[in-house]
Amino acid sequence: MLEKMGIVVAFLISLTVLTINSLTIVEKVRNLKNGTSKKKKRIRKRLRPKRQRQRIRR
């Protein structure tokens, strides 16, 4: 029984990893098609440190 459970768990883990990878690939493809989402991400990265600085000052 333990061996069967281990095999089932291994299959579930592999399936979840594959689904996550496929979702990330789909997002990357959409970003390449749009080209705007990448710019937004860069702007967000620039704004984050400024917000942190303001918190430190307060």
Swiss-Prot record:
Organism for this UniProt entry: Bacillus subtilis (strain 168)
Segment forming the signal sequence: none
Protein name as it appears in the record: SPbeta prophage-derived uncharacterized protein YonT
Cellular component per GO, a single term: plasma membrane
Region (Disordered): 35-58
Location in or out of the cell: Cell membrane
Domain of life: Bacteria
Name of the coding gene: yonT
Membrane topology label: Single-pass membrane protein
Record-annotated membrane-spanning stretches: 6-26
Keywords, alphabetical: Cell membrane, Membrane, Transmembrane, Transmembrane helix
Comp. bias (Basic residues): 36-58
